[in-house]
Regions:
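Histidine/acidic residue-rich metal-binding segments in metalloenzymes
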Residues: 116-130, 146-227, 231-254, 264-281, ...
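Divalent metal-coordination and catalytic microenvironments
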Residues: 13, 35, 46, 99, ...
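Alpha-helical scaffold segments that flank or form the walls of functional sites
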Residues: 55-106, 112-129, 152-159
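Active-site gating loops and adjacent loop-to-helix segments of metal-dependent hydrolytic enzymes
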Residues: 52-84, 164, 209-227, 245-250, ...
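Histidine-centered catalytic micro-motifs
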Residues: 41-52, 107, 194-203
Length: 358
């Protein structure tokens, strides 16, 4: 990716002309891009804005080694943190600085937090609505069926403004995948919202749940409105099973979200692309009670994804970038995303001649 120097004319917040445009009309404001690489605004398709400690004094990691331990540690500590609006806003500012113009954030909903996290993130987003678009997912971080009252709160969160309903390891954590998916897809059907389910379960258990999600998506006519986040099982299933799962994902336009995880096999981006499966990228939790890592720079995360995938060629590096741009836009259903006339003029300039050179 990278081409000849071109002029771009923006009118009323949208790209009007690309290439050979020359100077704008009377009153136009000219900005010299200095030959840098122009991209559409970056899309962070998997974040946890409510969890961040961004802007606070350094806190050493105290979470346990497994999912349950991490959840318990966070629930005990978060009540002593500054308001969500303050922390989420500080992290959004960092993301904006790095060229992120759209964020999908999962936000914890449970009997302790209630809808406070959702309200806090929505408020932080509203204060920055001219700079970034934030889509909130109601997320049952502490489990849904194992935490009585959470399902009702999830429904209320979507009614209060969440664009999507989430889920968490229907089998591995909630221990009842059928009921878990009944609740999640029931909320989606009731409110007409999107679905984005965290799925860490590996092996046959994870593969079976992905196929169950595909079946629910098909049955409810939700093609193009469902995402499976992490989907670790996809990276390790046998070839025949992979082909069947990938075909179902592609048919229903179900996206997979990755965060370039460090302790598990990365999603096979090339194989998924060749099968027609969309993959998007996020930064997950940034400097929070789960992990000390992250800084809001999605391009850095895309480079990490390329490195974890063993990519070296320009085409492969561009594939990693696609997860942070067009892949995210496809997952979130952003209309007109890109650099074509008529596209929203949410643009980023990078000091490079090509993506690989970045």
């Amino acid at each position: 990716m990278g081409g000849p120097l071109s002029d771009v004319v923006v009118d009323d917040g949208r790209i009007a002309v690309v290439g050979g445009a020359g100077p704008g009309g009377e009153g136009a404001i000219e900005f010299d891009g200095g030959g840098e690489l122009l991209l559409p605004g970056l899309v962070d398709a998997h974040a946890h804005l409510d969890k961040t400690l961004w802007g606070l004094p350094w806190r050493s990691h105290t979470g346990g080694p497994d999912l349950a331990g991490l959840i318990a540690n966070e629930r005990a500590a978060r009540r002593h943190l500054p308001p969500v609006t303050e922390r989420a806003g500080a992290l959004l500012d960092a993301c904006i600085t790095h060229g992120v113009t759209t964020v999908r954030s999962h936000v914890d909903v449970d009997p302790d937090a209630g809808l406070g996290g959702v309200e806090g993130v929505l408020a932080a987003a509203e204060a920055r609505r001219d700079q970034v678009t934030v889509e909130v997912v109601a997320f049952p971080q502490s489990g849904m069926l194992v935490e009585p009252g959470t399902a009702e709160l999830m429904n209320a969160a979507v009614a209060a403004g969440c664009a999507a309903v989430g889920g968490l390891d229907p089998a591995g954590f909630d221990r009842d995948p059928v009921r878990h998916l009944d609740v999640v897809f029931g909320i989606a059907e009731r409110h007409g919202c999107k679905v984005d389910i965290h799925l860490h379960d590996r092996g046959e258990l994870g593969a079976w749940q992905i196929e169950a999600i595909i079946a629910r998506t098909r049955a409810l006519g939700l093609a193009g409105r469902v995402t499976v986040s992490h989907a670790f099982a996809v990276a390790t299933v046998p070839d025949e099973r992979f082909a069947r799962i990938a075909a179902g994902l592609a048919e229903q336009r179900i996206s997979l979200a990755t965060v370039a995880p460090g302790r598990t096999e990365p999603l096979p981006l090339r194989r998924l692309r060749d099968a027609g499966v969309n993959v998007c990228l996020g930064q997950d939790g940034i400097r929070d009670l789960w992990s000390p890592y992250g800084n809001g720079d999605l391009m850095e995360r895309a480079a990490l994804l390329a490195w974890r995938s063993g990519f070296r060629g320009d085409d492969d590096i561009e594939l990693a970038l696609d997860t942070a741009t067009f892949g995210g836009a496809r997952a979130l259903g952003i209309d007109g995303y890109g650099l074509d006339p008529g596209s929203p003029a949410d643009l980023v300039l990078l000091p490079a001649a090509t993506v690989a050179g970045r």
